[in-house]
């Protein structure tokens, strides 16, 4: 039905400015950000998945949004930008993380990436702290640089503890509350009054279902074939159509995007190595 699909479609459209913002923040170029957004817009997988009334689109939307906030935090520095300003990006990231896991559990897996980015950022602040102590031990340091190094040495322990405590609230407590609130329609169901024990039962059922799933389907393919789209998913084939007419829905990416993109990722890995 139209009502089931229109909201997911709108979220799919909203992903385009998110992609632009992500690419712009990474590349610092409007040209490359526009190209990334165009390639995303013409991808068949994105087009289909946002129009078939599944919940994946909502999870991916919030994952993209939380990654944008974490990327902004990655590019900030609480020594220079101030602790409160960095908290804005971190807080927004944590709330979006809650929305992501409330939409689908894939938000949990994306949260692992957030953790890596966050602790890497803290490690960079720690390295700056050590370097500042070394600079202060040297002689002949410029007064302005000496003041900033002193600021780093004095604030690192306090800022780090405050940041970690802030993250406990915004990445553990608040997401848990958001996740629980997403079950309000379930708990308030008029036909049968459900309890928190029932909510926990749903969690164990979902985990057991996915961890023990052995069922197959004709269009399944192993994960290592996905980047090459060797066997796309065939969702729908029309029936009872006029002679000479056919209708089908298949989910697969744009080969011009996926194949060249996959090769580009491999090339980037070699360049980093």
Regions found by a protein language model. Name each.
Residues 24-27, 66-90, 119-129:
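Membrane-interface transmembrane helices that cradle and orient dolichyl/undecaprenyl
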Residues 239-273:
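Hydrophobic, aromatic-rich transmembrane alpha-helices
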Residues 36-41, 48, 68, 97, ...:
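Short helix- or helix-capping micro-motifs
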Residues 6-27, 65-69, 267-272:
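Transmembrane-helix motifs of polytopic, lipid-linked glycan transferases
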């Amino acid at each position: 039905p139209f009502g089931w699909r229109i909201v997911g479609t709108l979220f799919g459209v909203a992903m385009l400015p998110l992609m632009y913002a992500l690419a712009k923040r990474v590349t610092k170029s409007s040209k490359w950000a526009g190209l990334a957004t165009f390639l995303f817009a013409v991808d068949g997988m994105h087009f289909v998945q946002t129009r078939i009334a599944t919940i994946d689109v909502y999870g991916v939307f919030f994952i993209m949004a939380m990654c944008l906030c974490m990327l902004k935090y990655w590019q900030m520095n609480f020594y220079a930008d101030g602790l409160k300003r960095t908290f804005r990006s971190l807080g927004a990231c944590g709330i979006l993380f809650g929305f992501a896991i409330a939409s689908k559990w894939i938000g949990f897996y994306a949260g692992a990436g957030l953790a890596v980015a966050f602790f890497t950022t803290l490690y960079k602040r720690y390295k700056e702290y050590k370097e500042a102590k070394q600079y202060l031990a040297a002689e002949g340091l410029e007064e302005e640089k000496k003041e900033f190094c002193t600021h780093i040495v004095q604030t690192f322990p306090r800022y780090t503890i405050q940041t970690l405590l802030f993250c406990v609230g915004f990445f553990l407590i608040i997401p848990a509350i958001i996740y629980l609130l997403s079950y309000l329609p379930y708990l308030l169901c008029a036909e049968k009054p459900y309890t928190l024990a029932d909510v926990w039962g749903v969690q164990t059922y979902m985990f057991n279902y996915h961890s023990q799933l052995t069922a197959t389907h004709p269009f399944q393919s192993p994960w290592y074939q996905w980047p090459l789209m060797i066997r796309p998913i065939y969702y729908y084939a029309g029936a009872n159509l006029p002679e000479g007419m056919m209708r089908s829905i298949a989910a697969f990416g744009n080969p011009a995007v996926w194949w060249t993109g996959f090769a580009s990722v491999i090339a980037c890995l070699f360049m980093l190595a």
